[in-house]
Regions:
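Metal-centered catalytic cores of metalloenzymes
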Residues: 23-87, 91-156
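Bacterial Sec-dependent N-terminal signal peptides
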Residues: 1-36
Length: 156
């Protein structure tokens, strides 16, 4: 093999090796990295659809880990008309829209003002809607069985 052919072969090897490295890096980006999001969601009766006159409020804070699709939050509420009868996470639904619940929170403290922590694992199909802020929580009471407090879950 002459000198020019060997040079060309070496250049080809370098290009091929670089291409393999580039593909490996690109693939690992899409299959191994996760994103961590902070989550918040103030809630009140005005966000319930249809709205109600509750003076109760709620604050949701936490994070979402896309590698294991886990939403981990603390929910504080105060001033409800009575203790919660249920707390749900609904979606997908934009602000001002309703949808069926996807998660039922358990071990809810039976107090008109309280705090609880929870984790919910989302499916891959649900994750896109969650990241698009299309999930909400609501707190139900005996006086407001369709929901006394609602808050959109917002990821940052």
């Amino acid at each position: 093999m002459n000198y020019q052919a060997m040079k060309l072969l070496n250049v080809f090897k370098i290009i091929a090796f670089s291409f393999i490295i580039l593909i490996s890096v690109k693939c690992s980006k899409y299959h191994g990295e996760s994103e961590q999001y902070t989550v918040d969601g103030p809630g009140n009766g005005a966000q319930v659809v249809p709205a109600n006159s509750s003076t109760g409020t709620a604050v949701l804070a936490g994070d979402y880990n896309s590698s294991n699709n886990t939403l981990s939050c603390i929910l504080n509420w105060s001033g409800l008309s009575g203790p919660p009868t249920a707390i749900h996470i609904h979606g997908p639904a934009a602000v001002g829209r309703n949808n069926i619940y996807q998660f039922v929170l358990v071990k809810v403290p039976a107090v008109a003002s309280g705090v609880m922590s929870f984790e919910s694992v989302f499916t891959e199909a649900q994750e896109g809607s969650l990241i698009s802020n299309a999930f909400y929580y609501d707190i139900h009471t005996a006086a407001n069985p369709n929901g006394e407090i609602r808050g959109q879950i917002i990821l940052h």
